[in-house]
Amino acid sequence: MERGRMLVLDRKPLTPAWASPMRQALEGVQGYKAGMTLAEAARRTGLSAFSKLASNENLLGPSPKVAEAVMAAMAEPHIYPDPHSDVLRAAIGARLGVSPARVVVSPGSEALIDYVFRAVLHPGDSILLSSPTFPTYEIFGRCAEARIIDVPRLANFDIDVPAVCAAAALGPKLLVLCTPNNPTGNALKAADFQAILAATPRSTVVFVDEAYREYHEAFDTFAMLDAWGGPWVSARTFSKAYGLAGLRMGYGVASSPELVDYLDRIRPPFNVTAVSQAAALAAWEDQDYLKRTVDLTIAERGRVEAVLDDMGVEHTESHANFVFLRSPAGPEATAAHLLHQGLIIRPTPVAGGWVRITIGRPADNDALIAALPAALSL
């Protein structure tokens, strides 16, 4: 595709299997497909032990302080949780240097994506994104009957900055930037982020997905967004580096308390449990543990990437807790082979045969390194 050209995705709807009373717009929506569970892996293989390297969880686990906080919160399960997560929002705001009124808490960052898309989009509005990227943007966009404008990424999966700037200048209702990007691991440089913002009208809402930010804190996102001056939301999560994927905890920071107020009108009441709030607060306050786990993960990622380089395997420059690599054997064949070695990875539909593999504990990565040569050369 020539630089600067855009794709407007208009996929044909699925043929309904029954006379559905549901909204017609949902007929063309494919639901999100999560990574394989441990139970499914066991059913398929008959094995009982696996390294789960498909969903970018932190296999090192959360801070030890989380378990104590969870047990304390369980003492009163009959009491509703704080509906606004005020204690957690105050702690987040204090560390990030923003008013708690600009912080929103959600059950996972996917819920925050949903809130923003439903609050912002009318049918026919446009969303600008760059594929391949996290599929829920397109899913929620189609549920909102929005028009998806896709500026495909370059061959190395970096954002095509001039093309995105040209598309952003046309004033989409919502601009989505994922950095580091899922599933490729690429991260925006500060100069490129600044260029995209400079091209974007202040009538556009900018949504920045920073679920993997702890692995690559390259620049002050909030300061650059505030300097731009339009409406924005940055989404972050406790599911990755903080190790709380099973408790579903995400949070975001917005450009203004007024924007958060609109999101609160959509957010269901009591949507974040008392246990999840307590766990997130304990994890948030143990920054020493967070740093140790992030540092170890980055070091282990470098070890895996060095092996890939020695093997001559093409991979991206990942800035997250996973590697994204091309499999000569094909993604499905590679994933199936590794599954029977006790390794669950994520095949992707990205053209060219790419798989995404979470960086696990050192022992998980040892097993992966030992199994990769055969899995990639089937």
Swiss-Prot record:
Gene: hisC2
Cited SUPFAM superfamilies: PLP-dependent transferases
Subunit: Homodimer.
Entry EC number(s): 2.6.1.9
Keyword terms of this UniProt record: Amino-acid biosynthesis, Aminotransferase, Histidine biosynthesis, Pyridoxal phosphate, Transferase
Keyword Secreted set for record: no
Modified residues (N6-(pyridoxal phosphate)lysine): 240
Natural source organism: Caulobacter vibrioides (strain ATCC 19089 / CIP 103742 / CB 15) (Caulobacter crescentus)
Pfam families: Aminotran_1_2
NCBIfam families (UniProt xref): hisC
Keyword Iron-sulfur assigned: no
Entry-linked Gene3D superfamilies: Aspartate Aminotransferase, domain 1 (3.90.1150.10), Type I PLP-dependent aspartate aminotransferase-like (Major domain) (3.40.640.10)
Cysteines paired by S-S bonds: none
A Gene Ontology biological process term: L-histidine biosynthetic process
Family: Belongs to the class-II pyridoxal-phosphate-dependent aminotransferase family. Histidinol-phosphate aminotransferase subfamily.
Enzyme class: transferase
Cofactor dependency: pyridoxal 5'-phosphate
HAMAP family for the chain: HisC_aminotrans_2
Lineage of source species: Bacteria, Pseudomonadati, Pseudomonadota, Alphaproteobacteria, Caulobacterales
Pathway participation: Amino-acid biosynthesis; L-histidine biosynthesis; L-histidine from 5-phospho-alpha-D-ribose 1-diphosphate: step 7/9
Protein name: Histidinol-phosphate aminotransferase 2
Reaction equations catalysed: L-histidinol phosphate + 2-oxoglutarate = 3-(imidazol-4-yl)-2-oxopropyl phosphate + L-glutamate
InterPro entries: Aminotrans_II_pyridoxalP_BS, Aminotransferase_I/II_large, HisP_aminotrans, HistidinolP_aminotransfase, PyrdxlP-dep_Trfase, PyrdxlP-dep_Trfase_major, PyrdxlP-dep_Trfase_small
